[in-house]
């Protein structure tokens, strides 16, 4: 309490004393206050507050108890107060002079005490009311819990009575809830009114009391709202359940009727599903009549169904049924039953009709089968041959099948359709069984054609088996014979090889027998006149020839090996005999004292061994000659190391000859020693006897040699071979005679030394030696002639074996072979055979010439070589003729090989062409299947690259075709006319197809290029529409903040400066779009294709016209002072412009700008993470906020300087009015694959640079230099990903997002409206800028073909163009940020929404899983730059968010910071290094679920040094110069 107004103005108030009263936790302090002469009581302190009611009933009761105690203690002081007042009265009576003062003191103290007691009484009443309120609330909550428990407990009912009692319980609970709710509301209202009244009573109202009243009211309202929310929700559930129960009761009667109808339909359906279709034609007709009766009865039940359906429809339309689904299901069930019944009726009618057709066809089949059975009996009695009978049986078999096929097919069809229930088709099965049994019985009697076919198949199988066996045998033998023959180094090894070849010879003979068997079977098949075996003789002929060749080769090798093995064995035996005789003649020295019988026995034994040795030695010699002859007759390279083998054999023969001569000398010496001890007379007698005997033998030999002298060398090989065999048999005797002559000569020398009378025998011995020497010379000549003659006849006979079978083949035309490999094999075999024949011819001629030369010697004058000379001449002529024929045949085969090779190469080219064409068609088809959204610019460019690849493949194919054509054109003259024509036609056909396909590819590529250019132009148009729309919106917004006519005038001029040059350029683009569309899709379709662009252009022009009109009207209204109305009009226009901005562009960009929008979305999302504080404003704007408030200086404009009043309007230089934007695909655009990156990143960078400019931040030049990135950095950034720039700039001010409806579509769509804003720099002369724009326009007006050429330029040129585009950007771009007041106005509703959601979360019955309202997006930054990764997550309870990097939990340290503000979570890295790159995951989790968002951080090197200052005039001059040069070069 305070004192009343005192007459003393300057009096002070003091506290005389104070009294504190405690009771439990309650406490009050009463102060006695004195002001001058006035004294009053005042409640200085109260704990708790007088209006504090507590938070629960227990707390309120405790407060009431403490207050009762406090009040009781205060009552105890009342007597002292009244005693003090009485004392004051006494003092006043005693001091009359100051009675007035004491009266006043008494009055104020009394009033204060009464007031204090009254307040405490009122608080006690307040606490009592509060206790009653909490009690009512508790009862209300208990009732709510009971009702909730009632709802949560499942209720089951089996009858309508139980359902009605349950409905009564619902009504009672609802009524009690309403009563408790009204009672609680009354109590709360009573308590609130009491608090308000208590707060406003008397003069005791102070701030503490007001605060206590507000706190208590808030508690009451919160508890009341919580309970009322539960009550309302519970009441809704009660009403809903009651309504459902009443609807269930309403449906019971309908269900009963529905069950009755359904039961009849179900029974009828079961009958229809189980009834048979009949077992005969009469039975089936009876069932058809019953079915017609059922149709009549079904119509009555259909009417009952329609009645129920109408009732159900009325129930559904009249009320909102809780059991609507049940009713619908029952109704649907009834409909399904009716439909099923109708379907079954229709099916049964159709099946009965089909069964009727089946039984009719079955009766006809039985009639035909009866006739066939009678005819079969007739055929059996006639005794026809197998082929004739087979033909008859086949005809009858066909007739059986044809006659029963219809009935059986109808039966199978009917059974397959009625397969769900086999009982219905039992009669059909039985009838089909009867028919099938009858057919099987008759088919068993018609088996002649099957037997005939089986026999034919057996023959064919046998032939195939034999031929397969022959081919396999040839395949096994051919690789063995392909190797060179190695006769080995020892007889055992040679014998093993010989056995192997003998086995091969046996195998060849067996194969030949199999081939003969196949030929016999083929002959048997030909007797059956089977046309399909016509091609087999050619194959058999080829196999016979191949087998014959292999047989000759095996025979030749076997003979060589046999001769070699026999030679080696014979030489070894001869060597053993030689060594044995040598040892005998060296060791067995005859002694004189030995018995003559012993010496004679030894001599005879040695003589026998000597004779055997001679035979074996000459046999070995003959085998060696035969082996050499075989080697000479063998093919070239047939034997491995031929010269070495011949040398080995010559060494063996030379060694054996020398050994024979040595042994002969040893034998003579042994004989001389043997007779040395005999008397001279005896030796002489023995000499004379031996001389006479030897002379007789020599004369006999002379007579034997006489027939040889008369020999005709032109005889047959047989006679010559017999003569040579006899000659070989005589060689041991001749050798023995030679040895005898030598022995006689030695004995002559020995006897002459002993003084024997030799004169009488000297002449005889001389004649003997002379005759023997002549005979030996003649024998050697005859032996050589005979050997060569035999060899000549052997070679001649071998030639006959080789040439005769080939004569017909050489004269005939070569067979048409399938592949070049077969032709190559046959050509190689022919060349090999010709070389062998030429070798044999040359060998025969050489032998013949040698024989004739030998015969012409004087010693051989009696030998006739006339016939041999004739044979030699004939052989030479035959050799020339055959060689010519063989060469001609090889030439034909070579031509065939060239033809096959050329044909195969052309076939390969055709296959390559087919493969290219198939893949190209697949490429076209896959591209045509893509929808319009997938067929974006990037996909189109990739398609063009693929088409270019196929064009290169076609050119490579053309080069291969040219090579093949050049190679085959020279050989066309050697081909037969038909083959040359075939190759020529095939080549021409391939060339034509390739030309046609090349034209298709070229046309398709041209179409794709035009489509690409069309999409580029459309993107340019859409880009201009977006910028123009955004500019119109910004100008409209800025105009609402302008307060002077001059500011609006400047704004209007700046807008006209932007829009005037760009509209004609946009109209040119639109015309180009129309022309391209008409060229691609035709006149009408092209016009429809361009309608959207034209319509949107008209809308933009209308908005521009409306804006200009609004600005003019605004200037007039500002002159008249009508600002409020003007602002409202502009706000309406501004809203319309925003609708225009967000409306038409969406549909246009779906098709043509989908990928660029995605790039912008990602770039904008990353920008949204960086540089934003909790109030949503960019950091740089907050840093300059103080400068903005203190500075009144505006930004200097290019033409005018604003006054103080004009500075109220945002500077027009901040409007960011761009000229015609550089599109991603224009001649001055970056490369095609960087559309997304440059569109998003450069647009964001240039747009953000405007936000760093403000009228209050300083001069223009400095701001321009700091805001624009360097050209090198810009060009490098264009090659990096689209998020590179986002880490260097702050988040753009989201003005357009707040004003457009994009905010309701999520952050992704909100960020798609960032644009490149370009205008003429303040320092650039307007003439230079206009000239640059004019040159750019001229470059875009080039022809379509030139634009297609420019589109294919290198990335280097496009990168330079990107640099020019960067230099043309004004640094003072961007939108003016809103004031803090407008920002508060925009944030306000969001705060209310958040509070509302918080209140809802208190009473929600279930949690909300985490949800990312902003996701992470991939970021690419330069090393050393700052970066922020930010997400925004919501959910209830509030989710906890954890950051992970590469799978490991991320924690804050000195390098990075993990930040959290409300629902936003972010990771901030001031300086990025390469180690920071990787996958980052933000995982949000609460009790309702877990959710994560991922992004990849890329770190690139920083190679571009910053440019601290730019000379804009120089940059613009460079830009214009490069543009002019580029335009001139591309003309």
Curated annotation (Swiss-Prot):
Gene3D superfamilies attached to this UniProt entry:
1.20.58.60, Immunoglobulins (2.60.40.10)
Start and end of every Ig-like domain?
1410-1498
Major place of residence: cytoplasm
* Disulphide connectivity of cysteines: none
Modifications after synthesis and translation: Ubiquitinated and degradated by the CDC20-APC/C pathway. During brain development, CDC20-APC/C complex degrades CCDC141 after centrosome translocation into the dilated area. CCDC141 is restabilized in the dilation until the centrosome enters the dilation, at which point it is once again immediately destabilized by CDC20-APC/C complex. The oscillatory regulation of CCDC141 protein is needed for proper cortical migration. Phosphorylation at Thr-91 by PLK1 affects CCDC141 degradation.
What is the consequence of disrupting this locus? Knockout mice are born at the expected Mendelian frequency and are viable and fertile; they have normal body weight at birth and during the juvenile stage. Adult knockout mice have a normal appearance and exhibited no obvious changes in overall brain weight or morphology. However deficient mice show delayed cortical migration and abnormal behaviors associated with psychiatric disorders. Deficient mice exhibit impaired recognition memory and spatial reference memory.
A single Pfam family it belongs to is I-set
Gene Ontology CC: one annotated term: cytoplasm
Q: Name one GO biological process term.
A: cerebral cortex radially oriented cell migration
Modification type Phosphothreonine: residues: 91
Q: Where in the cell is it found?
A: Cytoplasm; Cytoplasm, Cytoskeleton, Microtubule organizing center, Centrosome
List compositional bias (Basic and acidic residues) regions by residue number: 1172-1191
**What segment(s) does the record annotate as region Disordered?**
1170-1230, 1368-1401
**Entry keywords, A to Z:** Coiled coil, Cytoplasm, Cytoskeleton, Phosphoprotein, Ubl conjugation
Question: Where do the coiled-coil regions begin and end?
Answer: 67-94, 865-892, 947-1000
Q: What is the effect of changing residue 123 to A?
A: Induced abnormal dilation formation. Delayed radial migration with decreases of migration distance and speed. More resistant to degradation during the G2/M phase. Abolishes ubiquitination. Abolishes ubiquitinatination
Q: What is the effect of changing residue 660 to A?
A: Does not affect ubiqutination. Abolishes ubiquitinatination
Question: According to its UniProt entry, what is the function of this protein?
Answer: Plays a critical role in cortical radial and GnRH neurons migration during brain development. Regulates cortical radial migration by negatively controlling the activity of histone deacetylase 6 (HDAC6) and promotes centrosome maturation. CAMDI is required for dilation formation of cortical neurons during radial migration. Plays a critical role in learning and memory performance through regulation of AMPA-selective glutamate receptors (AMPARs) cell surface expression in competition with KIBRA.
Name under which the protein is recorded: Coiled-coil domain-containing protein 141
The organism's lineage is: Eukaryota, Metazoa, Chordata, Craniata, Vertebrata
Q: Which gene encodes it?
A: Ccdc141
């Amino acid at each position: 309490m305070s004192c009343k107004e005192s007459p003393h103005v300057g009096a002070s108030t003091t506290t005389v004393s104070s009294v504190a009263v405690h009771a439990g936790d309650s406490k009050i302090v009463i102060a006695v206050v004195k002001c001058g002469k006035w004294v009053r009581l005042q409640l200085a302190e109260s704990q708790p507050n007088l209006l504090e009611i507590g938070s629960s009933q227990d707390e309120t009761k405790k407060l009431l108890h403490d207050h009762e105690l406090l009040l009781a203690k205060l009552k105890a002081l009342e007597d002292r107060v009244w005693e003090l007042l009485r004392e004051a009265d006494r003092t006043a009576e005693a001091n009359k002079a100051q009675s007035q003062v004491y009266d006043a003191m008494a009055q104020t103290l009394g009033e204060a005490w009464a007031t204090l007691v009254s307040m405490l009484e009122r608080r006690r009443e307040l606490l009592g009311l509060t206790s009653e309120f909490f009690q009512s609330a508790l009862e209300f909550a208990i009732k709510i819990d009971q009702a909730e428990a009632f709802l949560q407990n499942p209720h089951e009912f089996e009858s309508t009575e139980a359902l009605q009692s349950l409905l009564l319980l619902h009504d009672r609970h609802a009524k009690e809830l309403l009563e408790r709710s009204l009672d609680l509301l009354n109590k709360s209202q009573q308590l609130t009114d009491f608090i308000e009244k208590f707060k406003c009573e008397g003069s005791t109202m102070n701030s503490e009391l007001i605060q206590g009243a507000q706190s208590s009211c808030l508690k009451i309202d919160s508890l009341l709202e919580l309970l009322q929310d539960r009550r309302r929700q519970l009441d809704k559930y009660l009403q809903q359940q009651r309504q459902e129960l009443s609807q269930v009761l309403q449906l019971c009667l309908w269900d009963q009727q529905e069950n009755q109808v359904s039961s009849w339909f179900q029974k009828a359906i079961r009958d229809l599903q189980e009834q048979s279709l009949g077992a005969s034609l009469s039975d089936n007709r009876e069932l058809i009549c019953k079915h017609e009766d059922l149709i009549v009865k079904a119509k009555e039940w259909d009417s009952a169904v329609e009645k129920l359906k109408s009732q159900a429809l009325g129930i559904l339309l009249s009320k909102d049924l809780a059991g609507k689904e049940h009713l619908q299901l029952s109704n649907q069930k009834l409909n399904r039953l009716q439909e099923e019944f109708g379907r079954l009726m229709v099916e049964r009618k159709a099946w009965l009709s089909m069964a009727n057709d089946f039984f009719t066809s079955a009766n006809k089949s039985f009639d035909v089968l009866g006739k066939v059975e009678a005819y079969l009996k007739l055929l059996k009695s006639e005794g026809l041959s197998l082929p004739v009978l087979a033909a008859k049986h086949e005809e009858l078999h066909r007739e059986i099948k044809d006659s029963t096929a219809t009935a059986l097919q109808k039966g199978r069809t009917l059974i397959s359709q009625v397969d769900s229930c086999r009982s219905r088709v039992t009669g059909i099965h039985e009838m089909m069984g009867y028919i099938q049994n009858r057919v099987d019985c008759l088919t068993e009697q018609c088996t002649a054609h099957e037997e005939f076919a089986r026999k034919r198949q057996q023959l064919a199988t046998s032939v195939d088996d034999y031929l397969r066996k022959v081919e396999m045998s040839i395949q096994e033998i051919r690789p063995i014979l392909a190797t060179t023959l190695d006769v080995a180094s020892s007889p055992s090894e040679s014998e093993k090889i010989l056995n192997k070849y003998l086995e091969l010879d046996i195998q060849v003979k067996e194969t030949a027998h199999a081939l003969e068997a196949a030929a016999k079977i083929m002959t048997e098949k030909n007797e059956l006149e089977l046309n399909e075996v016509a091609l087999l003789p050619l194959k058999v002929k080829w196999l016979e020839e191949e087998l014959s060749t292999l047989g000759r080769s095996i025979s030749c090798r076997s003979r060589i090996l046999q001769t070699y093995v026999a030679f080696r064995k014979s030489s070894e035996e001869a060597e053993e005999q030689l060594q044995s005789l040598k040892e005998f003649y060296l060791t067995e020295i005859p002694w004189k004292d030995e018995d003559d019988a012993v010496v004679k026995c030894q001599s005879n034994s040695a003589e026998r061994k000597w004779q055997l040795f001679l035979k074996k030695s000459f046999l070995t010699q003959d085998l060696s000659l035969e082996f050499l002859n075989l080697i000479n007759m063998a093919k070239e390279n047939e034997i491995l190391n031929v010269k070495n083998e011949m040398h080995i054999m010559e060494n063996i023969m030379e060694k054996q000859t020398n050994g024979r001569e040595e042994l002969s000398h040893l034998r003579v010496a042994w004989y001389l020693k043997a007779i040395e001890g005999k008397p001279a007379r005896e030796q002489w007698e023995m000499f004379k006897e031996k001389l006479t005997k030897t002379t007789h033998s020599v004369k006999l030999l002379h007579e034997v040699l006489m027939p040889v002298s008369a020999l005709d060398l032109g005889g047959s090989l047989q006679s010559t071979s017999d003569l040579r065999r006899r000659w070989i048999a005589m060689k041991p005797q001749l050798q023995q005679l030679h040895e005898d002559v030598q022995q006689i000569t030695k004995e002559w020398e020995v006897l002459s030394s002993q003084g024997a009378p030799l004169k009488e025998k000297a002449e005889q011995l001389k004649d003997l030696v002379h005759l023997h020497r002549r005979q030996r010379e003649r024998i050697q000549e005859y032996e050589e002639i005979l050997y060569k003659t035999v060899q000549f006849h052997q070679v001649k006979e071998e030639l006959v074996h080789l040439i005769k079978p080939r004569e017909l083949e050489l004269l005939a035309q070569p067979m048409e072979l399938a592949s070049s490999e077969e032709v190559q094999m046959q050509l190689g075999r022919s060349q090999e055979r010709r070389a062998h024949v030429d070798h044999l011819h040359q060998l025969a001629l050489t032998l013949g010439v040698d024989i004739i030369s030998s015969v012409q010697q004087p010693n051989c004058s009696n030998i006739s070589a006339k016939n041999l000379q004739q044979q030699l001449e004939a052989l030479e002529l035959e050799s020339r003729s055959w060689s010519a024929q063989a060469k001609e045949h090889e030439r034909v085969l070579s031509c065939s090989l060239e033809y096959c090779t050329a044909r195969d190469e052309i076939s390969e080219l055709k296959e390559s062409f087919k493969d290219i064409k198939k893949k190209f068609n697949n490429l076209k088809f896959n591209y045509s299947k893509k929808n319009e959204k997938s067929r974006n610019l990037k996909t189109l460019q990739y398609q063009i690259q693929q088409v270019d690849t196929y064009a290169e493949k076609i050119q490579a194919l053309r080069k291969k075709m040219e090579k093949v054509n050049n190679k085959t054109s020279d050989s066309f003259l050697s081909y037969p006319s038909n083959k040359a024509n075939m190759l020529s036609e095939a080549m021409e056909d391939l060339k034509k197809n390739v030309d046609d396909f090349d034209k298709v590819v070229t046309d398709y590529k041209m179409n794709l290029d035009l489509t690409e250019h069309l999409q580029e132009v459309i993107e340019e148009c859409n880009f201009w529409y977006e910028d123009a729309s955004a500019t119109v919106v910004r100008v409209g917004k800025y105009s609402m903040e302008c307060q002077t006519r001059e500011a609006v005038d400047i704004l209007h001029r700046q807008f006209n400066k932007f829009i005037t040059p760009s509209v004609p350029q946009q109209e040119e683009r639109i015309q180009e779009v129309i022309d391209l569309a008409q060229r691609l899709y035709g006149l009408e379709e092209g016009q429809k294709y361009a309608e959207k662009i034209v319509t949107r252009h008209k809308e933009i022009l209308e908005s521009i016209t409306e804006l200009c009109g609004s600005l003019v009207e605004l200037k007039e209204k500002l002159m008249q002072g009508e600002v409020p109305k003007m602002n409202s009009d502009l706000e309406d226009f501004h809203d319309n412009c925003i609708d225009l901005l967000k409306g038409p562009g969406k549909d246009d960009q779906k098709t043509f700008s989908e990928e660029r929008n995605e790039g912008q979305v990602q770039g904008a999302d990353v920008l949204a993470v960086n540089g934003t504080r909790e109030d949503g404003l960019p950091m740089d704007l907050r840093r300059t906020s103080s400068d903005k408030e203190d500075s009144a200086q505006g930004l200097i404009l290019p033409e005018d300087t604003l006054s103080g009043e004009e500075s109220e309007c945002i500077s027009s230089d901040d409007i960011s009015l761009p000229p015609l934007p550089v599109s991603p695909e224009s001649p001055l655009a970056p490369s095609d694959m960087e559309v997304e990156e440059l569109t998003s990143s450069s647009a964001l960078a240039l747009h953000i640079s405007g936000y760093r400019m403000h009228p209050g931040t300083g001069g223009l030049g400095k701001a321009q230099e700091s805001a624009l990135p360097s050209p090198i950095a810009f060009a490098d950034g264009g090659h990096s990903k689209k998020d590179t720039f986002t880490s260097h700039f702050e988040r753009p001010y989201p003005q357009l997002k707040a004003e457009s409806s994009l905010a309701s579509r999520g952050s992704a769509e909100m960020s798609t409206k960032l644009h490149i804003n370009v205008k003429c720099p303040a320092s650039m002369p307007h003439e230079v800028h206009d000239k640059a724009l004019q040159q750019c326009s001229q470059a875009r007006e080039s022809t379509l073909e030139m634009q297609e050429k420019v589109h294919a330029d290198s990335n280097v040129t496009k990168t330079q163009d990107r640099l020019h585009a960067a230099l043309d950007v004004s640094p003072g771009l961007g939108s003016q940020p809103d004031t803090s007041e407008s920002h508060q106005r925009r944030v306000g509703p969001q705060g209310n929404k958040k509070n509302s959601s918080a209140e809802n979360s208190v009473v929600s019955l279930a949690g909300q899983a985490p949800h990312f309202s902003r996701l992470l997006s991939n970021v690419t930054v330069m090393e050393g730059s700052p970066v922020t990764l930010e997400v925004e997550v919501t959910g209830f309870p509030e989710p906890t968010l954890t950051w992970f990097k590469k799978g490991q939990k991320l924690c804050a340290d000195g390098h990075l910071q993990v930040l959290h503000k409300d629902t936003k979570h972010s990771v901030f890295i001031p300086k990025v290094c390469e180690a920071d790159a990787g996958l980052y995951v933000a995982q949000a989790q609460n009790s309702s679920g877990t959710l994560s968002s991922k992004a990849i951080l890329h770190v690139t090197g920083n190679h571009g040094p910053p440019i601290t200052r730019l000379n804009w005039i120089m940059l613009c001059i460079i830009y214009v110069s490069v543009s002019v040069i580029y335009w001139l070069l591309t003309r």
